[in-house]
Swiss-Prot record:
Encoding gene (name): dapA
Site (Part of a proton relay during catalysis): T46, Y109
Protein known as: 4-hydroxy-tetrahydrodipicolinate synthase
Chief site of localization: cytoplasm
Any Pfam family the entry gives: DHDPS
Active site: Y135, K163
Complex formation: Homotetramer; dimer of dimers.
Residues binding pyruvate, per UniProt: T47, I204
High-level lineage: Bacteria, Bacillati, Bacillota, Bacillota incertae sedis, Caldicellulosiruptorales
């Protein structure tokens, strides 16, 4: 059984002016997704800026979201690390806190080999008893999980899914062919329909932070056989999706949410605020779609 089908939001983490986590706003964001069509909440994925958090804060954010959701939707905890023992530690803690699943980015910077990937994920698999989503995002990590490697990983009982953000649809199709028991989620908002067309069952989405219903609807339309409606909505959203990635994620999505009145603060350094030129491009994309700007 899949961890979820549909749209999983890669939830942002709101910060106060002095950069502490704004738990009051975080609670409102969680409630927003509970009230809308979001199918799962991914806390402390890349969009949630866990690389800027010490472990105690990272785990407190995970705990808070799990408690707030209270079992109403699956909560998947981002606990990836390029240090295997650290990844194991965070995984065990997230499981203890009640996470429904774990999202693990591949080791980054030190990168490793395909053999190292298998050994890394085997250690994590053996340490927990909840589902693991492998996250392949070579543009950030410098490391690509090959389909043959994913086939080996699929033999591990807790490796249940992959978030595929390589941008290579042929590779996604090869994973679907070689790994029939692995659920595939698009890791790119501009490729939801293409990934679904080769066997995907959903998306882990940045876009869903601001348009949760529309993101869910793309997947629902496609999986219900309304392929043309899914395609039309995917294309209609493309200008906003492009604007959300005009600078490094999550800079634009946080700016968009602030424009919409969510008051999520700015990203932590080394990420910064948007340039004025790009901010105007983002603002125009939101207005053109019909989103109410409250600034």
């Amino acid at each position: 059984m899949p961890i979820f089908k549909g749209s999983g939001v890669a939830l942002i983490t709101p910060f106060k002016d002095e950069e502490s986590v704004d738990f009051e706003v975080l609670g409102r964001l969680v409630d927003f997704h509970l009230e809308h069509k979001t199918d799962a909440i991914i806390v402390c994925g890349t969009t949630g800026e866990p690389s800027t958090m010490p472990d105690d804060e990272h785990l407190e954010v995970i705990r808070f979201v799990i408690d707030r959701v209270a079992g109403r939707k699956p909560v998947i905890a981002g606990v990836g690390s390029n240090h295997t023992k650290h990844a194991v530690y965070l995984s065990k803690k997230a499981q203890e806190l009640g996470a429904d699943g774990l999202l693990h980015v591949t080791p980054y910077y030190n990168k490793t080999t395909q053999k190292g990937l298998i050994e890394h994920f085997k250690e994590i698999n053996d340490a927990v008893s909840i589902p693991i989503i492998v996250y392949n995002v070579p543009s950030r990590t410098g490391l690509n999980i090959l389909p043959e490697t994913m086939k080996e990983l699929s033999k591990l009982p807790n490796i249940r899914a992959i978030k595929e953000a390589s941008g290579n649809i042929t590779q996604v199709a090869e994973i679907a062919m070689l790994c029939p028991d692995i659920d595939i989620y698009s890791g790119n908002d501009d490729q939801i329909v293409p990934v679904l067309s080769v066997g995907g069952i959903g998306v882990i989405s940045v876009l869903a932070n601001i348009l949760p219903d529309e993101t869910h609807d793309i997947v629902e339309y496609f999986l219900n056989g309304q392929v043309e409606k899914a395609k039309e909505l995917q294309l209609k959203l493309l200008p906003i999706i492009k604007a959300l990635f005009i600078e490094v994620n999550p800079i634009p999505v946080k700016e968009a949410m602030n424009m919409m009145g969510f008051n999520v603060g700015r990203p932590r350094l080394p990420l910064t605020t948007m340039t004025e030129k790009n901010r105007e491009i983002l603002k125009k994309a939101l207005i053109d779609y019909g989103i109410n700007i409250k600034e």
